[in-house]
């Protein structure tokens, strides 16, 4: 068996195990009994989970859920729970742009950790409705790249990374209220914050220990 096939098999087994561990919710109605996985049931309450690596497949699922909930009710808030190490910039920006595109306001709640693109999306929530649980951690840093190939291609990719970094810094400055030059300095290396520090920095608006009436 090739290394590629082995990796695919391991990934499939992991996905199958995770799927088997998803709790099911059974509801009774006049029409009978219906079963939902827990995430589908929470989606009915306008709750979306952004957990794990930010990549294209996950971004497509998040975007689809945002658009679906907008179609269901364009005037009611959506709650995006985040526990993510970050990932692809393009995938993250697809989610970010959709959050801004739709009519409902999107509140963001960090549980566990929001790092890299995860912290970017945490800050992207509706101002006044960005939260972190008491022991959550947040980390911001600059985008990374691993360009290979001819020297000219590497140079082109380097320019693109710098352009992307500048754009992300501008957005973070707007979302946090921090000067762009401070953002540029802070993201040069991994910049870690606890929940209280994330509030002081402007990445979130409130630290939560108990559920407020608005959530």
Curated annotation (Swiss-Prot):
Tell me the name of the encoding gene.
clpP
Q: What is its EC number?
A: 3.4.21.92
Quote the protein name from its UniProt record: ATP-dependent Clp protease proteolytic subunit
Q: Which HAMAP family match?
A: ClpP
Q: Which organism is it from?
A: Psychrobacter cryohalolentis (strain ATCC BAA-1226 / DSM 17306 / VKM B-2378 / K5)
Q: What role does it play? A: Cleaves peptides in various proteins in a process that requires ATP hydrolysis. Has a chymotrypsin-like activity. Plays a major role in the degradation of misfolded proteins.
Record keyword Protein transport present: no
An annotated GO BP: protein quality control for misfolded or incompletely synthesized proteins
Family the UniProt entry places it in: Belongs to the peptidase S14 family.
The record's section on InterPro entries has: ClpP, ClpP/crotonase-like_dom_sf, ClpP/TepA, ClpP_His_AS
**One short Pfam family name for this protein?**
CLP_protease
Q: Any idea which GO molecular function terms this record carries?
A: ATP-dependent peptidase activity; ATPase binding; serine-type endopeptidase activity
């Amino acid at each position: 068996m090739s290394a590629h096939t082995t990796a695919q098999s391991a990934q499939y087994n992991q996905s199958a195990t995770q799927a088997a561990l998803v709790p099911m919710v059974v509801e009774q109605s006049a029409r009978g009994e219906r079963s939902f996985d827990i995430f589908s049931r929470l989606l009915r309450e306008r709750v979306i989970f952004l957990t794990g690596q930010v990549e294209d497949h996950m971004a497509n699922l998040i975007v689809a859920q945002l658009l679906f909930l907008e179609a269901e009710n364009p005037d009611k808030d959506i709650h995006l729970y985040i526990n993510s190490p970050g990932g692809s910039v393009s995938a993250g920006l697809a989610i970010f742009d959709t959050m801004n595109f739709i009519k409902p306001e999107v509140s963001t709640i960090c549980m566990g950790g929001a790092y890299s693109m995860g912290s970017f999306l945490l800050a992207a929530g509706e101002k006044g409705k960005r939260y972190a649980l008491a022991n959550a951690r947040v980390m911001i840093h600059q985008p990374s790249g691993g360009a290979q190939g001819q020297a000219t291609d590497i140079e082109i990719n380097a320019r693109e990374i710098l352009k992307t970094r500048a754009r992300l810094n501008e957005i973070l400055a707007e979302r946090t209220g921090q000067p762009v030059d401070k953002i540029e300095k802070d993201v040069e290396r991994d910049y870690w914050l606890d929940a209280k520090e994330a509030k002081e920095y402007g990445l979130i608006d409130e630290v939560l220990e108990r559920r407020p009436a608005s959530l």
